[in-house]
Amino acid sequence: MALHTVLIMLSLLPMLEAQNPEHANITIGEPITNETLGWLSDKWFFMGAAFRKLEYRQAIQMMQTEFFYLTTNLINDTIELRESQTIGDQCVYNSTHLGFQRENGTFSKYEGGVETFAHLIVLRKHGAFMLAFDLNDEKKRGLSLYAKRPDMTLELREVFQKAVKHVGMDESEIIFVDWKKDKCGQQEKKQLELGKETKKDPEEGQA
């Protein structure tokens, strides 16, 4: 499921802050600093998620893979999101902007007159982060995982599994991404190579 779509469809309530997150090795409610924003400005891979609501689970199953780029703007506190999704045999591109609230550590998306929120959970040690949604609603709650590399370590997998159980869900509800099904990575690589060749041609013509 696309990151911006998740932010539109789900809204967060801070029930998790009332729990003890140490059991899942996660920290809730940390302020978002410029250092964090610099760390987030990178390429990210959607690794998996656990969502209670059926249509959200189905949306994840329809999307084979997703990677995206985050570019932060410190002047107006927004984040540009550029994503590439593999859906079937197609590579689908999309771009949008996210807001963020520094004090309570949340991302936000304003759509159709409604602003929804997701709590950012940084897993810096693992080069990853999670987003938590609707944790007070047993039928809608969800947790998603993103990492800087598509090859997930066993330790990161276990951290996410523990976090999912900690918010009252079951490991069986997790859908992990199979990056062997990615169609967008090769396309991006070809576009980058083509761009390099295009830059070389004018130089060769002047030689």
UniProtKB/Swiss-Prot annotation:
Keywords: Acute phase, Disulfide bond, Glycoprotein, Secreted, Signal, Transport. Disulfide bonds join C91-C184. The keyword Glycoprotein applies. Glycans are attached at N25, N34, N76, N94, N104. GO terms for biological process: acute-phase response; regulation of immune system process. Residues 1-18 form the signal peptide. The keyword Lyase does not apply. GO terms for cellular component: extracellular space. Functions as a transport protein in the blood stream. Binds various ligands in the interior of its beta-barrel domain. Appears to function in modulating the activity of the immune system during the acute-phase reaction. Contains a beta-barrel that binds various ligands in its interior. Eight genes coding for different forms of alpha-1-AGP are present in mus carolis. This is Alpha-1-acid glycoprotein 8. It comes from Mus caroli. The gene is Orm8.
